[in-house]
Regions:
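Conserved phosphate/metal-binding and DNA-contacting active-site motifs used
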Residues: 1-137
Length: 137
């Protein structure tokens, strides 16, 4: 197993901002909050993260020291979240998404084979969510 050095959350957030993203400080996995590791704890984070300056981003480390995870503000960023546990179906759905939407270098695998494909948008979009699908044997 190879050990990878994780970037300091502030350095990561500043780099994301420099590359045109809006970083969001997110609760660390050990915090005593609902959805720990996935939930922003900053009040009004949707507004504050939209135009946070580098100085503001540096302050987050002091104001929210337990928010060690980092999310990205959507709107001009969308994700195709493929939460399918069959590798063959995940691959087929991801291939179809890439054929329709185009290739993307932004790919995240959490619990394999589930995958999220990230795309930048030309104009902001509201969240679109499909109904949950249940497959029977």
């Amino acid at each position: 197993m190879t050990a990878h050095a994780l970037p300091n959350p502030t350095e990561l957030r500043l780099a994301l901002r420099e590359n045109g993203y809006c970083p969001v400080p997110v609760s660390g996995p050990g915090m005593n909050v609902n959805s720990a590791g996935k939930r922003p704890v900053m009040p009004a984070w949707e507004r504050k993260c939209l135009d946070a300056s580098p100085d503001e981003i540096r302050r987050w480390g002091t104001l929210y020291p337990d928010s060690t995870n980092t999310g990205l503000l959507c709107g001009l960023l969308a994700g195709v979240d493929i939460d399918v546990l069959r590798p063959d179906l995940t691959a087929a759905i991801a291939d179809r998404a890439r054929r329709i939407l185009g290739p993307t270098p932004l790919e995240r695998i959490g619990r394999e084979p589930k995958v999220l494909l990230g795309y930048r948008l030309a104009i902001p979009a509201d969240k679109i969510q499909t109904a949950g699908l249940m497959w029977t044997d």
